[in-house]
From Swiss-Prot:
Species in which this protein is naturally found: Schizosaccharomyces pombe (strain 972 / ATCC 24843) (Fission yeast)
Entry GO terms, CC: cytoplasm; cytoplasmic vesicle membrane; cytosol; fungal-type vacuole; Golgi apparatus; phagophore assembly site; phagophore assembly site membrane; vacuolar membrane
Protein name per the record: SVP1-like protein 2
Origin organism lineage: Eukaryota, Fungi, Dikarya, Ascomycota, Taphrinomycotina
Stretches forming WD repeats: 173-213, 218-257
Phenotype caused by lack of the gene: Impairs atg8-processing.
Protein's job: Involved in mitochondrial or peroxisomal functions and amino acid signaling pathways.
One GO BP: pexophagy
Repeat among keywords: yes
Domain of life: Eukaryota
Domain comment in the entry: May contain a beta-propeller domain involved in specific binding to phosphatidylinositol 3,5-bisphosphate (PIP2), leading to the association of the protein to the membrane.
Length: 364
């Protein structure tokens, strides 16, 4: 079975490209269906990006035996079955963002912006501190928003590209290195996490202000995927703890409430001690405050395995998860009204948060 290196979406999220040690596969997302595939006998790929639903793909060599040097970007025509253009950099390519007209190439120390057309014309080159090649891009009618780690550890740099000018800002997001980024469909919100993996922070991309923050847990771990729901009301977070956390971005409205009577969040159990009652009471009060402020995950789901390579919302309540071993799951989130009422501050309607497994299978 082929190993998946990365999975990426096309510009309208109607298709996904799977980079393999043996080539690539292109899938229609909803319903999930294989549309094209190419197997290479001489090496694998680390990145595959599709231009909308066309035959044009961007390829970067990778895996155990790279087909191309990792500092080369290949523009591939799937109909002609050959490269039609290539771009060679002095740095290994770590990540790519592409909206059809603007191409952002992330390396460990630089972000290159190219105009995509008959010729790849360099527009800008910015210094970064970005060992993972993190980069997120959204293009609307008015502008293009790009976010990536800045030169200083823990900072985000946000670019807004308009037709006639560019705005840029720096956000001091975390104390340690940024490990994961997400951007909302409109580009108005940015999600970030650091290598600690305990806090997820949401930012207003235009003002740089922090909208809210969520605690994934108290144990350090790597957050590998962050994704906003299409309506930007929920944020999904997947980590190497083999868990999927889903938070509400609007506190705890009646339609998205957590049962206050359920067992405490498992990470809090680390703080239990033999000094007993005062300590436990303190953490119980703290957890209830987290629930009230919406900072506790409404859904906490055990994943098939750790470190998924794609987390994508198919609609406001359905999530597609793809894993490195080519397995995938489709989860439908549910909210059911509880039969019991709980007294906490004021009487309120309680809801139970659950999910159903709609589909699972393999991409290879």
């Amino acid at each position: 079975m082929s190993t998946i290196n990365t999975v990426s979406l096309n510009q309208d999220a109607s298709c996904m490209s799977v980079a393999l040690d043996t080539g690539y596969k292109i899938f229609q997302i909803n319903p999930l269906k294989l549309r094209a595939q190419r197997q290479f006998n001489d090496g694998g790929l680390s990145i595959v990006k599709m231009l909308f639903r066309s035959n044009v793909l961007l390829l970067v060599g990778g895996g155990g035996n790279p087909k191309y040097a990792p500092n080369k970007l290949i523009v591939w025509d799937d109909v002609k079955e050959r490269p039609v253009k290539e771009l060679e950099l002095n740095f290994e390519i770590k990540g790519i963002c592409f909206d059809g007209k603007l191409l952002a190439i992330a390396t460990a120390s630089k972000l290159f912006l190219y105009q995509f057309g008959n010729n790849l014309k360099l527009q800008r080159c910015l210094d970064t501190q970005n060992p993972k090649g993190l980069c997120a891009m959204v293009t609307t009618v008015e502008k293009t928003a790009i976010v990536f780690p800045s030169r200083k550890v823990g900072q985000l740099q946000i670019l807004f590209l308009f037709k006639d000018h560019m705005n840029t800002s720096i956000v001091p997001a975390h104390d340690s290195e940024i490990s994961c980024l997400g951007i909302s469909k409109t580009g108005s919100k940015i999600a970030s996490s650091s290598t600690n993996g305990t806090l997820i922070r949401i930012w207003n991309s235009e003002t740089g202000e922090k909208i809210c923050e969520f605690r994934r847990g108290y144990q350090h771990t790597a957050v590998c995927q962050l994704a906003f729901s299409p309506d930007e009301l929920l944020l999904a977070c997947a980590s190497k703890k083999e868990t999927l956390h889903i938070f509400s971005l609007h506190g705890s409205p009646n339609t998205i409430r957590q049962l206050t009577s359920e067992e405490p969040y498992e990470e809090a159990s680390e703080f239990k001690s033999s000094t007993t009652e005062p300590r436990q009471t303190h953490w119980k009060r703290k957890l209830l405050k987290l629930i009230d402020s919406g900072k506790r995950a409404h859904w906490r789901i055990q994943l098939y395995q750790s470190n998924p390579v794609l987390l994508h919302w198919l609609d406001e309540m359905t999530i597609l998860i793809c894993y490195k071993d080519a397995a995938y799951q489709k989860l439908k989130l549910t909210i059911e009204e509880s039969s019991k009422s709980v007294e906490h501050a004021n009487q309120h309607v309680c809801f139970h948060y659950d999910y159903t497994l709609e589909a699972d299978g393999s991409l290879c």
